[in-house]
Amino acid sequence: MERTCLAVILAAGDSTRMKSSKSKVLHPVAGRPMIAHVVEAVASAGISSVALVVGRDAGEVAKAASIDGVGIEAYLQQQRLGTGHAVLAAREAIAKGYDDILVTYGDVPLQTNGPLKAARQGLAEGSDVVVIGFHTDRPTGYGRLLVKDGELIAIREEKDASDAERAVTWCNSGLMAINGRKALDLLSRIGNANAKGEFYLTDLVEIARSLGGRVTAVDAPEIEMTGCNNRAELAVIERFWQERRRREMMLAGVTMIAPETVFLSYDTVIGQDALIEPNVVFGPGAVIDSGAVIHAFSHIEGAHVSEGATVGPFARLRPGADLAMGSKVGNFCEVKNGRIGVGAKVNHLTYIGDAVVGAGSNIGAGTITCNYDGVNKSETVIGENAFIGSNSSLVAPVTIGDGAYIASGSVITVDVPADALALGRARQEIKPGRATLLRQRALAIKAAKKAEA
């Protein structure tokens, strides 16, 4: 029978070191609040029940933590009296009788499911408490994990450690798993007879051992256990998240010419054999199919780029942009809520908004779909194999038929039938010699102003 598990995520801190008007767990990593990354890691470890301990910005934190497939109940910690006290804020959830209780933190967004699963496996093998630790060459400031005969005998804080204990490089991450059937009893035994008068979760190690229980530790990569307390640490976490995800994508068959200059979001999807040139930013909701090419300095969010399509350089795809196979959106173009058909070309200096561009159509440089009248947005529909001349303005709502031609510089306000030629501009006039007169007049005005000065 599969073991049941409750994850208790501690997210009630005051976030004072973040110097922010909002809780630190709401700050984004890869376009997503860091608390959501933690819930995702918990879910990927097979845990579908979460007790979220909140304090500051409780409603916003609970909302940010919500992801599909995970049941979350929020519990308010009224006072900040230590980690042991924080876990007991979720007493009601713990009392429901889970096999495993996993305690983690909302400001550790790089954690993955491996150490979480390992901690649960330790419980399944008979431990009452399993602490997740990490090895580091910079152990100063961390509690050391002291192990004897395969069991964790203590977590020694640095100020209390001997010289030999300070030499230990296996450190406490703060994350741990607890036997769910004994959790409330163990937690209720934590005292606050210390300098700060707080209840420390780490005391569970000695409490469980004093009751004859087995306590063990499992290892996690140091970077996965990195917590976030300020903006500098947030930047470090973002960098490592990006490096890890880029590597995963490249190993899956995505080419990144200068990966350190490519920035991904938490949900970016890029298919095999896609090519990503330098200095590309993917906002949330970007899907790039196999074989697509994203040229340098492009920004893509909420958009889909099909196989064989080309974007950029210096292009922007906004939410709702959908490029069909073999289509092209070139330099200094922006597409928002626009569908670009198979083989269609939007090559330069163009805005396509709330529009459909049919297969094989060509949109000339400087074309604008005028989709907004200051109050409402309207749609432009361009048929297949149409040709839109440069510097044209298509004032929505308007439809351009299949195979139609729009003369350069036109302002189109009326539907154009299929295979028709439309011109919407003033007729050109030529007046011989008039340029000389205009020039002489301008020079005379300039001379008069100079004389007055």
Swiss-Prot record:
NADP is among the record's keywords: no
Linker: annotated segments: 232-252
Origin species: Rhizobium etli (strain ATCC 51251 / DSM 11541 / JCM 21823 / NBRC 15573 / CFN 42)
GO biological process, one term: lipid A biosynthetic process
Name of the protein described by the UniProt record: Bifunctional protein GlmU
Pfam families: Hexapep, NTP_transf_3
Positions of the UniProt region annotated as Pyrophosphorylase: 1-231
Binding site for Mg(2+): 107, 229
Gene transcribed to yield this protein: glmU
Gene Ontology CC annotations of this record: cytoplasm; membrane
Disulfide-linked positions: none
